[in-house]
C-alpha cells in the first residue's frame, strides 16, 4: 500500500483549541477551559463521594465548532468537571470526574459558581479545524491491514 493511500484511509477531521490571546464574548455559545456556567435549572456543581465540589474543567458549545463527530449529533453543550487531585487515567466516570451533556431541547441557565480553589485559570477557547489528523501508531485506531 502506498503512503498516500495510507494517509487517505487514516485521515480524520479534528479540532485544535487555542486558549486565551483574545477577548472572550461572554456569550452562551462560547467554549471555555476552566469554567462552566451553563446548567439545567435544577443542577449545581457535582460533588465527589466526600461531598467536595468538583472543579469546572471545560464547557464546549458544539454547534459553533468547525467539526463535530456524528457520535455527538443532537448534543448542544458538554460540560466536564474534575477533582483534585486529578483522576487516574482510565478511571471510571462518576466520583472524580463527570461529563454532562445537554441536547438542543433542554433549557439551560447561566449560573456563576466560583471555584476559587481550582488550579485551572479560566480561558475562552477558539476552535480551529484540522482537516487531516492521524492516529498515533502505538495508540490504536489503525486497521490491521495497514
Which sequence ranges carry the predicted segments?
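Preference for intrinsically disordered or flexible, low-complexity segments
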Residues: 1-146
Amino acid at each position: 500500500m502506498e503512503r498516500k493511500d495510507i494517509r487517505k484511509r487514516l485521515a480524520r477531521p479534528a479540532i485544535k483549541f487555542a486558549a486565551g490571546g483574545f477577548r472572550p464574548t461572554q456569550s452562551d455559545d462560547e467554549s471555555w477551559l476552566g469554567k462552566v456556567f451553563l446548567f439545567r435549572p435544577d443542577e449545581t456543581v457535582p460533588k465527589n463521594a466526600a461531598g467536595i465540589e468538583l472543579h469546572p474543567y471545560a464547557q464546549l458549545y458544539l454547534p459553533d465548532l468547525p467539526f463535530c463527530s456524528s457520535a455527538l449529533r443532537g448534543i448542544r453543550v458538554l460540560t466536564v468537571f474534575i477533582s483534585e487531585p486529578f483522576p487516574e487515567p482510565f478511571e471510571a466516570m462518576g466520583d472524580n470526574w463527570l461529563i454532562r451533556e445537554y441536547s438542543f431541547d433542554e433549557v439551560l441557565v447561566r449560573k456563576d459558581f466560583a471555584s476559587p480553589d481550582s488550579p485551572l485559570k479560566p480561558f475562552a477557547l477558539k476552535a480551529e479545524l484540522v482537516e487531516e489528523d492521524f492516529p498515533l501508531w502505538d495508540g490504536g485506531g489503525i486497521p490491521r491491514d495497514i
